[in-house]
């Protein structure tokens, strides 16, 4: 939480370095398929709650990260940006050259989502012809409520477990998203 970060910053960073900085992780088949769909002009945006940067690693360009990214960090005083390597290699609480505390650019409990990211996400969803929702239980708000802005013709849900939106979907695929999107022949799509 934001309160924990502010009151126990050193302990926060111990946990953060141990559990949230994951080196060597690679995009899966779903990340790669989405990047290929975007490259072919079939996908306008990826809206994600993930904070790992894997969509960008796979090649997606238009990624809206609702909860931020562990790959970006900033000084709380002057705003200077720092990459994940700086955080990983620093000792204790990472400090900026100005002396300010560096914070990961992730949304912690008690913090608001970025207004610009919300606005863009709602615009993409409300203008979409087809909305594919995948790999989410649709239980985390406010992101789960974004589905209410969809006015297009086809809603597709890809998730291992049932979601509250399944009854409104045109297609529900109850399989892991990596397997489903990984099986698409995205290379054969034409304009």
Language-model segments: residues:
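Conserved catalytic core of sirtuin-type NAD+-dependent deacylases
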Residues: 1-189
